Amino acid sequence: MATKITGVFILILTITFSSSSAVTATQQAPSSSPPVLTCTEELVMFSPCLPYVSSPPNNMSETPDPICCSVFTSSVHSSTGNCLCYLLRQPMILGFPLDRSRLISLSQICTDQNSEESFESLCSVSESPELPPLQSIQFTNPFVSGNNVSASPQSVDLAPEVSPSSDLFSPETATLAPPPPPPPLPVLQYFSSDSLKIRNFWFPSTIIMTFATSILARI
């Protein structure tokens, strides 16, 4: 009797454990699926295609890289495939210009479709009237052509603060300098009344003597 009870108990534990394992496996299955990329992440993942789709002087490649084709194909066929339409509608979204014709050609080069307008038709207003929301991104252009660095989001340099120069007036540091001396007064010649009388006397006397001398000289 005890043996039968033990066997039934073991059977119940086995069934319970099997049911718990099945429920746990069912609950863990959805978590193994890869997360869906956001629109911003789709554009960042598109970076291997930039050497091909960038406008001069950033067009460093004449053919797209195999990684570019893989990223483009997976992005176009994903649920957020129209995120790449930002590249066609806003060519300067990454901070530097993109070649529209090369963007459209990726449909023919990287996919099995023969239609060159497949990517363009996907991004048309009729197919994608509204694009998914896009978070703000700052995409740095990694390409350099010759000695010129390609256009990239610029950092704003703030002008340095101007320190007060030594010749500016400062109430705290200014010292009062003595005023300049007044200009010298003009020198005036003063004469006493006696000397003025003598000068007035000699002046007509001289004229008379000169006039008398000239008369005597004529006689």
Swiss-Prot record:
<feature type="lipid moiety-binding region" description="GPI-anchor amidated serine">
    <location>
        <position position="192"/>
    </location>
</feature>
<comment type="similarity">
    <text>Belongs to the plant LTP family.</text>
</comment>
<feature type="propeptide" description="Removed in mature form">
    <location>
        <begin position="193"/>
        <end position="219"/>
    </location>
</feature>
<dbReference type="Pfam" id="PF14368">
    <property type="entry name" value="LTP_2"/>
</dbReference>
<keyword id="KW-0732">Signal</keyword>
<feature type="disulfide bond">
    <location>
        <begin position="39"/>
        <end position="85"/>
    </location>
</feature>
<feature type="disulfide bond">
    <location>
        <begin position="83"/>
        <end position="123"/>
    </location>
</feature>
<keyword id="KW-1015">Disulfide bond</keyword>
<protein>
    <recommendedName>
        <fullName>Non-specific lipid transfer protein GPI-anchored 25</fullName>
    </recommendedName>
</protein>
<dbReference type="InterPro" id="IPR053353">
    <property type="entry name" value="Plant_LTP_GPI-anchored"/>
</dbReference>
<dbReference type="InterPro" id="IPR016140">
    <property type="entry name" value="Bifunc_inhib/LTP/seed_store"/>
</dbReference>
<dbReference type="GO" id="GO:0005886">
    <property type="term" value="C:plasma membrane"/>
</dbReference>
<keyword id="KW-0325">Glycoprotein</keyword>
<keyword id="KW-0336">GPI-anchor</keyword>
<feature type="region of interest" description="Disordered">
    <location>
        <begin position="152"/>
        <end position="181"/>
    </location>
</feature>
<keyword id="KW-0472">Membrane</keyword>
<feature type="glycosylation site" description="N-linked (GlcNAc...) asparagine">
    <location>
        <position position="59"/>
    </location>
</feature>
<keyword id="KW-0449">Lipoprotein</keyword>
<feature type="signal peptide">
    <location>
        <begin position="1"/>
        <end position="22"/>
    </location>
</feature>
<feature type="disulfide bond">
    <location>
        <begin position="49"/>
        <end position="68"/>
    </location>
</feature>
<dbReference type="InterPro" id="IPR036312">
    <property type="entry name" value="Bifun_inhib/LTP/seed_sf"/>
</dbReference>
<feature type="disulfide bond">
    <location>
        <begin position="69"/>
        <end position="110"/>
    </location>
</feature>
<feature type="glycosylation site" description="N-linked (GlcNAc...) asparagine">
    <location>
        <position position="148"/>
    </location>
</feature>
<keyword id="KW-1003">Cell membrane</keyword>
<dbReference type="GO" id="GO:0098552">
    <property type="term" value="C:side of membrane"/>
</dbReference>
<comment type="function">
    <text>Probable lipid transfer protein.</text>
</comment>
